[in-house]
């Protein structure tokens, strides 16, 4: 049952990216990005990453709502263009959906998905050796590594997000 849920969430994830790539108006593009972010958090949650899914949902989608709230307020259109108002945009959306459908049918026909990345074992994922303690949580080690080894990464990421918001606000404000 969980495999089907992940498969359906993956299809919704890719279809939402097709909808974003053929966006006719920034309002709908932001909405589709928010939906795809929420579905991506659901996929992470289904694989057991409860903390990571929650953090991505709060930080990424919170930032997305703020950025698209500002840009939508500054660059609002009286009659926004939808997917069916232009034949070229509708054609791009339908072609993207058909290619996703064909890919899904190809995967279901072969009943297997090849893994691109191969790891020798659990040792490639583990940062600290826990000995013979049995069960351990990977999330706690990832959070510890992020805030101990990745302090500069957190600072640079926060600074680039702030710069991105300021650039987007300046571009959409115009003259």
Curated annotation (Swiss-Prot):
Cysteine pairings via disulfide bonds: none
Membrane topology: Multi-pass membrane protein
Molecular function via GO: NADH dehydrogenase (ubiquinone) activity
GO cellular component, one term: mitochondrial inner membrane
Catalysed reactions listed for this entry: a ubiquinone + NADH + 5 H(+)(in) = a ubiquinol + NAD(+) + 4 H(+)(out)
Domain of life: Eukaryota
Transmembrane segments: 1-21, 25-45, 47-67, 88-108, 149-169
Location of this chain's protein in the cell: Mitochondrion inner membrane
Family to which this protein belongs: Belongs to the complex I subunit 6 family.
UniProt function note: Core subunit of the mitochondrial membrane respiratory chain NADH dehydrogenase (Complex I) which catalyzes electron transfer from NADH through the respiratory chain, using ubiquinone as an electron acceptor. Essential for the catalytic activity and assembly of complex I.
Presence of the UniProt keyword Transmembrane in the record: yes
Protein name: NADH-ubiquinone oxidoreductase chain 6
Species of the source: Phoca vitulina (Harbor seal)
Ranges in coiled-coil conformation: none
Pfam families, per the entry: Oxidored_q3
One GO BP: mitochondrial respiratory chain complex I assembly
Entry keyword annotation includes Membrane: yes
Record's subunit section: Core subunit of respiratory chain NADH dehydrogenase (Complex I) which is composed of 45 different subunits.
EC number(s) on file: 7.1.1.2
Keywords: Electron transport, Membrane, Mitochondrion, Mitochondrion inner membrane, NAD, Respiratory chain, Translocase, Transmembrane, Transmembrane helix, Transport, Ubiquinone
């Amino acid at each position: 049952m969980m495999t089907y849920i992940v498969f359906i969430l993956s299809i919704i994830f890719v279809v939402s990216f097709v909808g974003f790539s053929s966006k006719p108006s920034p309002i709908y593009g932001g909405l589709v990005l928010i939906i795809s972010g929420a579905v991506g958090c659901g996929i992470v949650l289904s694989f057991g990453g409860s903390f990571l899914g929650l953090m991505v949902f709060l930080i990424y989608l919170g930032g997305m709502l703020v950025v698209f709230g500002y840009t939508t307020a500054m660059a609002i259109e009286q009659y926004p263009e939808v997917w069916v108002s232009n034949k070229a945009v509708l054609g791009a959306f339908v072609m993207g959906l058909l290619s996703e459908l064909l890919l899904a049918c190809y995967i279901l026909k072969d009943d297997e998905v090849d893994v691109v990345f191969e790891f020798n074992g659990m040792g490639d994922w583990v940062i600290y050796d826990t000995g013979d303690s049995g069960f351990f949580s990977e999330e706690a080690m990832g959070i510890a590594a992020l805030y101990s080894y990745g302090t500069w990464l957190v600072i640079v990421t926060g600074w680039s997000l702030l710069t991105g918001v300021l650039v987007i606000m300046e571009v959409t404000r115009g003259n």
